[in-house]
Amino acid sequence: MKHRVLQIASALAMAGAALAAPAAQACDRVAAAQSDSQRLRTLMAESDAAFLDRNPSAAFYRGDFSDAGSLGDFSPAAYETERAAAMCDIAALATIDRAALTASERIAYDTFRYSQERTLAATEPDVLKTILALPIDHFQGIQGSYPGLSAPDGVMPFAAVEDYADNVARHGAYAQMVDDVIARFDTGLEQGITLPRLTVELMIDQLDTQLGAPEGSNPYYAPLRQLPESFTEAQKGQARAALISAVEGTLYPAMRKLRAYLADSYLPQARTSIGATATPGGDAYYAYRIAEMTTLPLTAEEVHRLGLSEVARINEARQQAIEERGDRRPPVYKTKESLQEAWYEVGRKVDAAIGPLFLRQPETELRIEPYEPYREQFFLAASYQPGKADGSRPGTFYFSGWNAAERELSPSIRLYMHEGNPGHHFQVMFAVEDESLPDLLRHGWFTAYGEGWALYAESLGYELGLYDDPVDRLQALEDGELKRAVRLVVDTGIHALGWTREQAVEYMVENGNPR
């Protein structure tokens, strides 16, 4: 979702009355001679194209590499631009008669308006202050995502001389982004808004993992291990020299700079508390995040109560499954390779079972792969990366095989149905492959919708008999339903109700999570 890729900043002195006049003038770009339907389509297309121009990294994931040497602007000034663009789009949208649109067009109209309004919601004073003060964390940050833009098995192309030149240019853009991140963290320190120490320590570990990666698995030197056969020897030599110089002379110094800043300057001042409301403006920011994730006007207390009731409901079903399972346990796999084979088997089983339920399936292939070494320690048990509609990149179900020898790792039917088929892969790729949709509906991400579909996809396991075995059913209950319900309780407890980390851990252990 675009306000996750680049959340907005602005001059907060702008009054509400300033919303319409300059925006209407700036947005007078939709031809009045067009029908309302045509004007809506044009407005949404122009808005999306402008957003991709401002945020080239968002374009990469759609297969648009026209500005592949850039990562976009991460400074506070960029957020002012995003706010102005949202104001402009809302003003232009107001000139289109919603009543004159078809039912499907009204959905597009409402979704577009909602998207722009959420962008503006990010500019509320306390919300914006927090967004600017906390530019990255261990889940959302350039230090975690950048390797995927730097290796041939990631998002970017490495087929032409220009692709290698763009990669070198991106390393320079990374260095500039590090400077912007540090400047924003410094502002947060001045305002008393910091990340928790544990989060900072994880970010330092991420950087250490990348800086210490052996040559054979180092993502930044990976392009040199797969130089195109079409390159002449001279081109290969130039590509090697340029990349080594960029990595050793620009990228690694920037990574070390960020690592040193986090360890020596930021960590000593990072907070020992973990809740959002422990920081200035945290109440407003957390309320914004609840609305962002749910699309509903819920309070933290309401979410907390919902979580408590769901935990009680699920625990009843869980207890029954435990009794039926007896001493049986899911098989454990001690190597990444054996775990991958087990995930393949789960995928084959689910794919065969869901066939009768769906008249069609995405054209884009779904592959199953372990996380790359640079991120397997820090990411979720599994996740999904969309493919490209033209078939040049499949959708990918990623799983964690980190430290498999010491951990009890088992594949899960429920998790495959959530992240893969018929979950995120179906929902995302059906939209991406439908070129009749506006790009916002093809590529936009709304958590309540995307995760809502994935939860529904999981539930089909009961209808299909995939959870008839109490071992599989207990996995679905404990690893899926119960963990989500527990997180509703724990998240709101920590961020709004003053829970300590110890309280959260105890509650999770009491409700099916291993310590």
Model-found features: residue ranges?
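N-terminal maturation segment of proteins
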Residues: 26-515
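Gram-negative bacterial Sec-dependent N-terminal signal peptides
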Residues: 1-24
